[in-house]
């Protein structure tokens, strides 16, 4: 996965939106908004996959003309975009870029049967990254997010990049 190119694409998209909408805000406001957007996208990812809906027999929402797998991939990539944007806004790109070397190792991780604890840990670390300005917590949250996509959801690097 070309994480450098994905970061550049995320930053470009964000700048395009800001220019088109004529948004003028402080860096703090921009960062705060990106964290909220990521939180919402992660919730949408969970809601789309429906792993936590133990009462349902058939899990996984789908958009018209898409499979549940394609719909979930779309939500996953939306969330990834905000991780990448935050890494740039907070000058934490090195955490994302360092993870490039560990992708093969992450792909060897054990698939979780119940994603609840992993999801809550990912969100807890994300909130710690925001409230305590912790790059290490961001790094851990990012790596759990990669595991979700590459292991627990079973996407390939190519699927995620495309």
Q: What positions do the PLM features span?
A:
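Flexible "arm" and connector segments at domain edges
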Residues: 1-162
């Amino acid at each position: 996965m070309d994480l450098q190119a994905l970061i550049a694409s995320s930053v470009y998209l964000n700048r395009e939106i800001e220019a088109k909408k004529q948004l003028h805000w402080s860096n703090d406001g921009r960062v705060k908004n990106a964290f909220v957007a990521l939180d919402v996208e992660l919730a949408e990812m969970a809601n789309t996959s429906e792993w936590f809906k133990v009462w349902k027999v058939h899990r996984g929402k789908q958009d018209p003309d898409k499979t549940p797998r394609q719909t979930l991939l779309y939500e996953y990539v939306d969330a990834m975009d905000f991780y990448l944007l935050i890494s740039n806004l907070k000058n934490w790109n090195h955490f994302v870029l360092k993870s490039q070397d560990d992708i093969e190792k992450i792909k060897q991780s054990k698939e979780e049967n119940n994603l609840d604890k992993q999801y809550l840990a990912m969100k807890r670390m994300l909130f710690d990254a925001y409230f305590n300005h912790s790059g290490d917590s961001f790094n851990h949250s990012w790596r759990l997010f990669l595991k979700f996509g590459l292991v627990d959801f079973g996407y390939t690097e190519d699927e995620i990049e495309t």
